Regions:
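Conserved strand-helix element at the start of the C-terminal RecA-like helicase core
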Residues: 146
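Long, charged, low-complexity intrinsically disordered regions
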Residues: 2-138, 150-219
């Protein structure tokens, strides 16, 4: 786990995937107390760790997610990687839960438009299911929890990459949240809902664009 400086960036590499969530949370809290803001970036296998640490931080401290995105980057020494990048601060800039609820209400056939990602399904199978649903609907929702988050993000990035989807496709909303664990109602786990829509261009804020460029240049 390395901490670089473009503002404060906690960069979680694939090799960090087995690190303790609380160790990352400690870094987030420290960064927030120092400067009032921190960027958390997870690469490939470490994306779930990043999501878990972000969620825990917002649950135990006055910390809010004001910007969160996923992207596919070409990075030195790592090649093509899937990335999740979030900017955390102490100011609540928007209500992602309300935006997700609005998107859910707009779905015409929620059960058909929702693709649940699990480790039991191959990426090829998931891609095929998504393409079948996109042939019927303009919008689909990809959901996952726990370690399947890595696959869900990879799936979404493959779909918006332009190589396999028949229609131009973009990310309308990325929602990171928590759900109660089925086998232990006293515990929660990170989960994501990724809303993909035809004709939408995936947009990044200026801050995220600059950070992603620096990641590609090997900050």
């Amino acid at each position: 786990m390395s901490q670089e400086s473009i503002g404060k960036v906690i960069l979680l590499q694939p090799a960090d995937a087995s690190a303790k969530t609380t160790d990352v949370v400690e870094g987030i809290i420290s960064g927030i107390m120092e400067t009032g803001e921190v960027n958390v970036v997870g690469l490939n296998e470490a994306m779930f760790l990043a999501c878990s640490a972000i969620n825990m931080s917002t649950e135990i401290a006055k910390v809010y997610v004001d910007d969160i995105d996923i992207a596919s980057l070409l990075m030195p020494n790592l090649g093509k990687v899937a990335v999740i990048s979030a900017h955390l601060s102490q100011k609540q800039a928007g209500d992602y839960a309300a935006l997700a609820e609005k998107e859910d209400k707009a779905l015409t056939d929620p059960s058909e438009q929702t693709i649940s990602v699990s480790r039991a399904s191959t990426m090829e199978r998931l891609l095929t299911i998504c393409l079948l649903r996109l042939a019927k609907f303009d919008e689909v929702k990809v959901v996952a929890a726990g370690g399947s988050i890595n696959d869900a993000i990879t799936l979404a990035l493959k779909l918006i990459g332009g190589q396999i989807s028949k229609d131009p496709l973009g990310i309308k909303l990325f929602h990171l949240h928590s759900i109660i664990m089925r086998n232990d109602p006293t515990k929660s786990i990170a989960a994501v809902s990724i809303y993909l829509q035809k004709g939408v261009t995936t947009r990044y804020t200026k801050r995220q664009s600059e950070l992603l460029k620096k990641l590609e240049s090997g900050i």
